[in-house]
Amino acid sequence: MTIAIRTTLDEPENHSDFVPHRPSRPEKTEPSKPFRLVSDYEPAGDQPQAISALCKDIQKGERDQVLLGVTGSGKTFTMAKVIEKLQRPSLILAPNKILAAQLYGEFKRFFPENAVEFFVSYYDYYQPEAYVPRTDTYIEKDSAINEAIDRMRHAATRSLLEREDVIIVASVSCLYGIGSVDTYSSMTFRLLKGQLVDQREIIRRLVALQYKRNEVAFGRGSFRVKGDTLEIFPSHYEDMAWRISFFGDEIEEISEFDPLTGVKIAKLDQIKIYANSHYVTPEPTLKAANNAIRRELDNRLREFKAEGKLLEAQRLEERTEFDLEMMAATGACSGIENYSRFLTGRAPGEPPPTLFEYLPDNALLFVDESHQTIPQINGMSRGDYRRKTTLADYGFRLPSCIDNRPLRFEEWNAMRPQTVYVSATPGPWELEQTGGVFVEQIIRPTGLVDPAIEVRPIEEQVDNLIFEAKKTAAAGWRSLVTTLTKRMAEDLTEYMYEAGLKVRYMHSDVETIERIELIRDLRLGVYDVLIGINLLREGLDIPECGLVAVLDADKEGFLRSETSLIQTIGRAARNAEGRVILYGDKITGSMARAMAETERRRIKQIAWNKAHNITPATVKRQVDDIVGHFGVVNSSEAAATIENHDPKVLARSISETEKEMLEAAANLEFEKAAQLRDVLHQLKRQELGLPPEKSSEIQGRSEAGRPGTRKTRSDKAREAKASKRVKQEAGEKLLRSRGH
């Protein structure tokens, strides 16, 4: 196997005749179930005609469709109905993690019997490798991986290879490279009851799949040996593991068990073990990659020396030789992604293998909030390319590092299956693909109409806002406020707090999980006002929102464009009493168009309600624990679910919660342990029969966005490093105390 090397830093453009990779996929081995949507509601309003039109055109083979659906019209329900009606696996593409998490929760409820999976970036913190020539500053890559999300990514790819009834909810990070389908699937292996196999051979294969032997801290992606018993914690499981019992070289029994209690859950006839990393590489490929990397290194060193760049040559040689030694010894190295093209055997400039290569041929793609998602896809590879060329120019990386990149727009466009673009404000590219034709979903099943809009002068806008926010809070509703800058959001939070309001801010410096918690706390009434910039827009489902205030609405630009204003206005459309205030001294073109479109929709919605004798009612939705899948405990709801059960059930719940709390503390997950402690207190209150008024009030979970808690990115980076160091030291101390 000979792998081509890169001799230039030029990025070849793919022409219109570009043909994407279509790797063969293994035969499905797990039984699949028909997609069956579980809901108390039937399609209403514009939903029936939208579902019918979309299904009809998909069956006719139309590659592109646009669903123009206003906020609260049930676009997610429409997508789910289309999937159920067509019985086809689907990928739901969201512009960010928050919306992806929200969609994941909804599809999980809609399809409890099917494989609904989550695929987003697994980085909690990520500082890419970079070099700044002007100041001669090298910035080393630094990151923190979220283990729960990594597990969900493995579960997603495994489901795509094993089942037909799969729905993947992903963010645009799915356009970045992962391991190739053929390598990832070919390195799996089966174990059968009664099979003759040497235990040492299984261990060798597990190590090749990047599983680690760990007799002390048995966790996901590890294995341990106890005499004739081998225990494996698969990469895609959260709280179950496999136990393989041998009699000599024969597999006597395979069972599934709880790794915490050791209790056997089920007996199995066979298991299929997938790799612990999407980037596993077979040994022959590693050797071929090693040879190709050396050839490219020699070629690049000759270029540097010919140009008199001796420092760059020395730097590149030392770094690359060290990486090659690490790969030869362990099969991996720090920054191995920069050699990803060698490991996949692809030619220079070819697209990397991504999640799209895992999709079956009959898959559907729904691009949610397409007006925001499509521009993201279009711009992802450009900034990445400039950073990588600088690293290669100054000898920090080989030229092939630029092949570790996200898909370019034209590559994604060629690879995507039949697509439905979903948005309240579709962009020009989507409408161009459909010739300006779209399916409209304006009428809401609830009869809610778009909110009334009022324009007020900027003079004394903050004091007026405080008055309106207090009035809204007194009525039992929440307020959303959008500003133009992070600094203004933080300063306004402090000012409104001093004015007696319960208020938080949310912007890009707030961690993803914290953002979800902030929205949950807002809905529960922990605080009444949330101030943001660009995050209080697409897809936020807050029926309790009674007021949306847009400060400096007449400052024409990206944050106050027609699309941005329509999306922001839509946040008040789930509440029958919702209203919008735009603060501006003049009405800009964007404001005029946004107000005109909102009024057009209002007229149509009011006419429908009148014709069908519908009285609009605020959406009633329980506050779901979206982040429950990320290992966070929802104390108030968790305790509430045990209410009215008999004493035996309550006692068992107390015992299980106490066990989970102790386990979390042992794993140094102190926040989770504290939350479980709160659940335990509430369960014990119920056991004692204390009345509800004696229970504690709803507590907020998010610590972010409080007045006076401004943090810069460097502050967060320091905190992440300090946290990582503390955990590492605690782990080492624990091992020393156990005599290891």
UniProtKB/Swiss-Prot annotation:
The keyword rRNA processing does not apply. Residues 651-686 form the UVR domain. GO terms for biological process: nucleotide-excision repair; SOS response. It comes from the Bacteria. Keywords: ATP-binding, Cytoplasm, DNA damage, DNA excision, DNA repair, Excision nuclease, Nucleotide-binding, SOS response. Residues 56-444 form the Helicase ATP-binding domain. A motif (Beta-hairpin) lies at residues 122-145. Residues 461-627 form the Helicase C-terminal domain. The keyword Nucleotide-binding applies. Residues 1-36, 687-740 are annotated as: Disordered. ATP binds at residues 69-76. Pfam families: Helicase_C, ResIII, UVR, UvrB, UvrB_inter. SUPFAM superfamilies: C-terminal UvrC-binding domain of UvrB, P-loop containing nucleoside triphosphate hydrolases. GO terms for cellular component: cytoplasm; excinuclease repair complex. One of its GO terms (molecular function) is ATP binding. Residues 8-33, 712-740 have a biased composition (Basic and acidic residues). PROSITE patterns: HELICASE_ATP_BIND_1 (PS51192), HELICASE_CTER (PS51194), UVR (PS50151). It is found in: Cytoplasm. The beta-hairpin motif is involved in DNA binding. The UvrABC repair system catalyzes the recognition and processing of DNA lesions. A damage recognition complex composed of 2 UvrA and 2 UvrB subunits scans DNA for abnormalities. Upon binding of the UvrA(2)B(2) complex to a putative damaged site, the DNA wraps around one UvrB monomer. DNA wrap is dependent on ATP binding by UvrB and probably causes local melting of the DNA helix, facilitating insertion of UvrB beta-hairpin between the DNA strands. Then UvrB probes one DNA strand for the presence of a lesion. Belongs to the UvrB family. Forms a heterotetramer with UvrA during the search for lesions. Interacts with UvrC in an incision complex. This is UvrABC system protein B. It comes from Zymomonas mobilis subsp. mobilis (strain ATCC 31821 / ZM4 / CP4).
